[in-house]
Amino acid sequence: MSYILGTNLNSNKQVKIALTRIFGIGPKKAIQVCDQLGLSDTIKVNKLTKYQFDQILKIISQNYLVDSELKRVIQRDIKRLISIGCYRGFRHNAGLPLRGQRTHTNAKTCRKLRYVSIRS
């Protein structure tokens, strides 16, 4: 098992698939990182050298917001929406869908999550 940015990467998977385990790195960003390093699409994590790991870490940390930094930015944006009193802020506060989805019969998951977070 290999660790990059505090995330455990499965050593038997391809690099582009394993990188998607990092919060903030999706399939397209993982492919971009591999292309910047010139890595093959089929190379596995356990075949990478120490230098290649360092280069992956360098590229990700310089070019992308990932893991705790990204979570902090998302939380800050939500707090800003709540503080300015906009519609999306009210919906975040109430734990309801933000983007106009139907709530009469749907949106059970949002309300369940809200109930669990209030209860604990």
Swiss-Prot record:
It comes from Marchantia polymorpha (Common liverwort). Pfam families: Ribosomal_S13 (PF00416). It is found in: Mitochondrion. The gene is RPS13. The keyword Ribonucleoprotein applies. Its main location: mitochondrion. InterPro entries: Rbsml_uS13_C, Ribosomal_uS13, Ribosomal_uS13-like_H2TH, Ribosomal_uS13_CS. This is Small ribosomal subunit protein uS13m. GO terms for molecular function: rRNA binding; structural constituent of ribosome. Located at the top of the head of the small subunit, it contacts several helices of the 18S rRNA. Part of the small ribosomal subunit.
